[in-house]
């Protein structure tokens, strides 16, 4: 009850009969009484007595202090259940206080009191549910705004800490919130209640949300009288969708969302645009593609600039919801490891790790899914001669329908792959003569149709091979019987093209009423062009289908058989194929299959460069709008920061499209990289390493390296983005390309502002990581001078990181064979720092030795030979700071090593003699640190204080 000492007594000024004029008549000495001379009446009261006294006070301040000290009172009486219940009952009476400030103060203490009751549940069972929760719920409808806000915050805090029982949520909380959102409820209270319902939905779970919250939420979305209510519903729409799941979202929420997106109030439409990504994540691919895309196009073309601004900011995140591991070539599972890093499974069922050079293929970036091997493939279906390039993925024309395509989850695909391989091993000899009629050498036409680019250009049908593999040769149908089966539609067929054209026509029709807006007019032009392109694509696909049909007829006529394959259409998700090479020797995996052409080289041919920016992963209209975000006119009509938003979401869009569609984004990325605003370039610089992982080494070397080089020469605000992820980017490059940057690392020491020491500190951090990427000679020739320069930096934080860098460098060079560079580095440390004329250099030498000992960068016998003699000579240094640090290092670090504790060598004797000399030093601090036991203090704290005190 410490706070009660501040309480004001409601007593007359002369009640105690004492005043400053009192004095002793005998001695005529004036006595001024002190408050410590009297026993306060409060000290004579019990905690409950003090609580009752001040809770009934007419002074508002006293009642506020009572509310603030309730938790302390509970702690004092927690040993007695009866007293705890008495305090809780007085809380209920205090909740009826007429002063809003008292009620608000009480509500601020409720979460703390509830937590105390939960921790002491055996003493006061059901205390919260019976005494506190009714107060919280009642205050949700309080007339005072401050009390309502405080109770709402308290309710959310209680739900977040799971202090409210599930039954109480259903029977006490939700009914009150539903009543507060009734049509006849107060407008302000209704709006706040809807917001509370939306925020508590993720905390109470799917079941309660669907049964109790969702019906009323749908009603509030259609509240015609209060646009504030609709705006709150729109702003929290994504949270509700993520809680209730896909089915409830599509059946109940989507119709309301469409209404909100066309609301008369622009604030409601803007809120819809801001939560569009969350809504999209809760729907299936088909609805996302057919309905939400058209709805989003309407928001992008909205008459209100604020709505368009919010829509463009959400465009990149919305496009990212179309991402599929099979189309992107990347799939990240647990432990943050890419599925591409998993072990490869050979035909014989033996798991082997992918062989790759460390400098060419870093551990966290390997070949994409497009370069994986086909699950359960047949040798006659995808034969390849040893002379073929690893970059070729050749599939004969007459067997193009024999490839197993997968649009399932990566986990399912992995399990199917194992079972498929086992089945393939058992049936390979039986199936080989019946399936394959293709020759080992593909024809030039095959190479043109099924090179890596055309292979990814259009999705292929999904085919089930199990039926054909499980049938005996005698049971397989004849070509005539196979031809009688009805043909299933494939992607790119006229029926699918008709659906696309119909979708485009509907979009154009919806936008025509807003043709006065230049943005809407531009959008109509884009959609019209897409409509014309879809018409042309329909003719091209029809011609290609006829050509494939002729090739298959020729194969059948030559004596081949087409197996009985059930073809199923799956246009809702991008497809991926994994091709397995059947070479008897060690398999050469297709590296970056989406990046390499028929000749195995990287990059794209001139014909591919000129191809239109068309893809099939996301609706083309969305991609066109995203690409238009770099248009200068957008900055004037939408948002001056629109280019920055485009740059921020570009890695997500690139991951969604996959590296096979990088040609759609290349020009946009180059435009952003040369943007006049440094914030745009800075955003790209911070994410270029992520984009390099997505694109693979071939495209990175061709398209990202030039931009990366430009960022290295940019402003410091841009360069810091490159520097923070320098190791992450360089490890993705080929060793030869990586070595080119050794000459540019020195430039990071030069900054626009010499006081920007954090830049140099980050450089030291990155150099520690870069040690593993370069050879010992490169480390010695290029990284060593930078490290020694940083060790002499003016700022202690930079020097501390640099000591770690030098010690790691000593470790790497000493482990090299032969350790010549390591010895030379140690000699340079001794010469430049151990014998430095400046005492700060000699102190740095001690710090480096200390770090080498702590991190075991050198074997102790080698340390005793190369560094310790020079270290011990500093015992006679004329500067006390150096001797203090030496005493700490010897006593607290060196003597803790087993080598110096167990061996009775001359090195141990030299250390003991040095410590004895330091214990007799004329400086008291040196004596202290040379005498104390190693475990009695922390070296890092003392050393840091020594370092900081010297500058």
UniProtKB/Swiss-Prot annotation:
Q: Repeats (HEAT): which ranges? A: 26-63, 82-119, 127-164, 168-206, 208-246, 248-285, 287-324, 502-539, 699-735, 777-815, 820-858, 862-899
In the record, Phosphoserine modifications are located at 936
The recorded induction information for this protein reads: Up-regulated in anti-Thy1 glomerulonephritis.
User: What Pfam family does this protein match (any one)?
Assistant: HEAT
Q: Where is the composition biased (Basic and acidic residues)?
A: 332-360, 464-483, 539-551
Region described as Disordered: spans on this chain = 326-395, 407-501, 539-569, 592-612
Signal peptide positions (record): none
- Keywords (A to Z) from UniProt: Phosphoprotein, Repeat
- What subunit structure does UniProt give? Serine/threonine-protein phosphatase 4 (PP4) occurs in different assemblies of the catalytic and one or more regulatory subunits. Component of the PP4 complex PPP4C-PPP4R1. Interacts with HDAC3.
User: Sorted alphabetically, which PANTHER family does this protein's record hold?
Assistant: SERINE/THREONINE-PROTEIN PHOSPHATASE PP2A 65 KDA REGULATORY SUBUNIT (PTHR10648), SERINE_THREONINE-PROTEIN PHOSPHATASE 4 REGULATORY SUBUNIT 1 (PTHR10648:SF8)
Q: What is this protein called?
A: Serine/threonine-protein phosphatase 4 regulatory subunit 1
Q: Which organism is it from?
A: Rattus norvegicus (Rat)
Classification lineage: Eukaryota, Metazoa, Chordata, Craniata, Vertebrata
């Amino acid at each position: 009850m410490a706070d009660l000492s501040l309480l004001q007594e409601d007593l007359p000024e002369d009640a105690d009969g004492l005043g400053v004029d009192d004095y002793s008549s005998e001695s005529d000495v004036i006595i001024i009484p002190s408050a410590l001379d009297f026993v306060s009446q409060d000290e004579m009261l019990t905690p409950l007595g003090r609580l009752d006294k001040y809770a009934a006070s007419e002074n508002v301040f006293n009642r506020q202090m009572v509310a603030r000290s309730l938790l302390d009172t509970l702690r004092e009486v927690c040993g007695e259940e009866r007293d705890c219940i008495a305090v809780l009952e007085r809380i209920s009476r205090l909740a009826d206080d007429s002063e809003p400030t008292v009620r608000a103060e009480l509500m601020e203490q409720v979460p703390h009191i509830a937590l105390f009751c939960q921790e002491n549940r055996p003493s006061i069972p059901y205390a919260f549910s019976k005494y506190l929760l009714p107060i919280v719920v009642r205050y949700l409808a309080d007339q005072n705004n401050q009390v309502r806000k405080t109770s709402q915050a308290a309710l959310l805090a209680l739900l977040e800490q799971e202090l409210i029982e599930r039954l109480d949520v259903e029977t006490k909380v939700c009914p009150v919130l539903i009543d507060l959102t009734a049509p006849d409820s107060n407008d302000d209270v209704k709006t706040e209640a809807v917001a509370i319902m939306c925020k508590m939905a993720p905390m109470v779970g799917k079941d309660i949300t669907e049964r109790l919250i969702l019906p009323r939420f749908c009603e509030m979305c259609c509240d015609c009288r209060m646009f504030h209510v609709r705006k709150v519903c729109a702003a929290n729409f994504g949270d509700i969708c993520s809680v209730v799941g896909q089915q409830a979202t599509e059946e109940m929420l989507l119709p309301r969302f469409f209404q909100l997106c066309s609301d008369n109030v622009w604030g409601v439409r803007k809120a819809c645009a801001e939560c569009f990504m969350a809504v999209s994540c809760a729907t299936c691919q088909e609805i996302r593609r057919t309905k939400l895309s058209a709805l989003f196009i309407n928001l992008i073309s909205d008459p209100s600039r604020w709505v368009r601004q919010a829509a463009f900011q959400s465009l990149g995140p919305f496009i990212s919801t179309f991402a599929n591991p099979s189309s992107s070539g990347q799939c990240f599972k647990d432990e943050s490891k890419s599925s591409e890093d998993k072990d490869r499974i050979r035909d014989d069922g033996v798991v082997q790790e992918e062989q790759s050079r460390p400098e060419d293929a870093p551990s966290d970036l390997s070949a994409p899914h497009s370069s994986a091997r086909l699950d359960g493939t047949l040798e006659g279906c995808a034969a390849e001669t040893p002379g073929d390039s690893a970059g070729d993925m050749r599939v004969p024309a007459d067997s193009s329908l024999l490839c197993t395509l997968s649009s399932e989850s990566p986990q399912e695909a992995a399990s199917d792959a194992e079972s498929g391989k086992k089945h393939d091993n058992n049936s390979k000899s039986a199936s080989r003569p019946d399936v394959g009629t293709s020759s080992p050498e593909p024809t030039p036409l095959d190479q043109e149709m099924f090179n890596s680019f055309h292979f990814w250009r259009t999705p292929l049908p999904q085919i089930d091979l199990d039926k054909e593999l499980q049938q005996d040769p005698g049971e397989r149908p004849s070509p005539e019987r196979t031809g009688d089966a009805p043909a299933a539609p494939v992607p790119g067929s006229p029926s699918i093209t008709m659906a696309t054209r119909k979708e485009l026509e509907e979009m154009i029709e919806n936008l025509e009423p807003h043709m006065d807006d230049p943005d809407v007019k531009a959008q109509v032009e884009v959609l019209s062009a897409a409509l014309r392109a879809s018409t042309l694509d329909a003719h091209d696909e029809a011609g290609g289908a006829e050509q494939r049909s002729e090739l298959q007829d020729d194969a059948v006529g030559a004596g081949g058989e087409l197996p009985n394959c059930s073809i199923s259409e799956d246009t809702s998700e991008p497809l991926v194929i994994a091709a397995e090479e059947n070479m008897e020797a060690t398999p050469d995996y297709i590296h970056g299959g989406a990046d390499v052409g028929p000749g195995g080289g990287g990059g794209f041919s001139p014909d591919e460069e000129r191809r239109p920016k068309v893809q099939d992963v996301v609706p083309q209209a969305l991609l066109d709008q995203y690409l238009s975000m770099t248009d200068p006119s957008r900055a004037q009509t939408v948002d001056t920061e629109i280019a920055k938003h485009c740059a921020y979401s570009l890695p997500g869009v690139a991951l969604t499209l996959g590296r096979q569609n990088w040609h759609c984004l290349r020009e946009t990325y180059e435009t952003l990289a040369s943007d006049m605003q440094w914030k745009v370039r800075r955003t790209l610089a911070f994410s270029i390493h992520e984009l390099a992982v997505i694109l693979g080494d071939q495209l990175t070397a061709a398209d990202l390296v030039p931009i990366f080089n430009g960022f290295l020469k940019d402003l410091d605000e841009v360069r810091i983005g490159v520097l923070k992820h320098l190791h992450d980017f360089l490890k993705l490059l080929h060793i030869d390309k990586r070595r080119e940057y050794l000459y540019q690392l020195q430039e990071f020491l030069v900054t626009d502002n010499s006081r920007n020491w954090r830049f140099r500190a980050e450089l030291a951090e990155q150099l520690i990581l870069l040690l593993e990427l370069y050879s010992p000679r490169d480390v010695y020739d290029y990284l060593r001078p930078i490290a020694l320069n940083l060790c002499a930096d003016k700022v202690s934080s930079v020097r501390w990181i640099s000591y770690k860098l030098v010690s790691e460098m000593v470790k790497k060079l000493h482990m090299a064979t032969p350790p010549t560079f390591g010895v030379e580095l140690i000699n340079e440390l001794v010469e430049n720092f151990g014998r430095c004329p400046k005492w700060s250099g000699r102190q740095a030498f001690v710090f480096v030795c200390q770090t080498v000992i702590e991190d075991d960068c050198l074997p102790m016998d080698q340390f005793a030979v190369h560094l310790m003699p020079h270290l011990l000579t500093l015992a006679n240094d004329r500067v006390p700071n150096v001797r203090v640090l030496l005493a700490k290092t010897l006593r607290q670090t060196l003597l803790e090593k087993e080598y110096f504790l167990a061996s009775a060598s001359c090195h141990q004797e030299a250390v003991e003699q040095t410590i004895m000399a330091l214990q007799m030093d004329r400086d008291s601090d040196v004596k202290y640190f040379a005498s104390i036991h190693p475990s009695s203090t922390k070296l890092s704290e003392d050393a840091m204080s020594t370092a900081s005190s010297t500058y």
